[in-house]
Amino acid sequence: MPFTLPREEQDGQARTQAERTARAETKMVLAAIDLLNTVGIQGTTLVAIGEKSGYSRGLATHHFGSKAGLFRTVLKRLSAAWSKQLNQQLDGKTGLEAVGIAIDAHLAHALKHPEYIRVQYILWGAAIDPASKFKPNAAEFMQIQRESVAAWIRGGQANGEIRQDIDPEHSAEHYYGGLIGIDHQWQVSPDFDLPAAYSDFKRNFLHMLRAT
């Protein structure tokens, strides 16, 4: 699970207000993730979230302000958890090694937590709506991901393993666009071979980057 509930009460001691607040928010975010996976955006209401998480609609409204506020929080929590996980695996690496590790990590995360990937795509799709109030969250996450990839490519260029004629920013766009496209096809095609698609993408992308 990308994030867990704060610790339970121990030794009969009551949780602090901050712990209760964090626990309530996490329970409601997890409820929203479950609802988005089962009934979609229309069915993921503050009332439904309150009922599923064991809280009231009033508390959900207090925490998130609105349905859009809830979706912003869901995206932030999923994005932050993924970024933390990826950074731990990268451990400061750069260049071709970092690109390969990141592609493998994306695949492992998708296979382990398909429900979280599905929620991200549901909300990213909804963010295209001109009236969407959480479009900036989706755009910010994607920009951060592209900037990370561009930094790995520049690191590889600095140590001579990546071609100097490669544009880091444009290559990062191709990288992230490729992974989004692969995952999107997987979401809508039950027979789509995700590991094979990732393997091909990894081989081709690294070949395109590698200095000869």
Tell what function each PLM region has:
Residues 73, 87-116, 168-175, 198:
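Hydrophobic alpha-helical connector segments
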Residues 38-42, 113, 159:
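Short coil/turn segments at alpha/beta junctions that flank glycine-rich nucleotide-binding fingerprints
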Residues 1-23:
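N-terminal intrinsically disordered/low-complexity leader segments
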Residues 98, 111-136:
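Amphipathic alpha-helical segments used for helix-helix packing
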Residues 27, 31, 35-69, 73:
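Helix-turn-helix
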Residues 117, 135-143, 157-205:
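Hydrophobic/aromatic-rich alpha-helical bundle segments in the mid-to-C-terminal region
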Residues 80-83, 87-88, 112, 132-159, ...:
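Amphipathic alpha-helical packing segments from all-alpha helical-bundle domains
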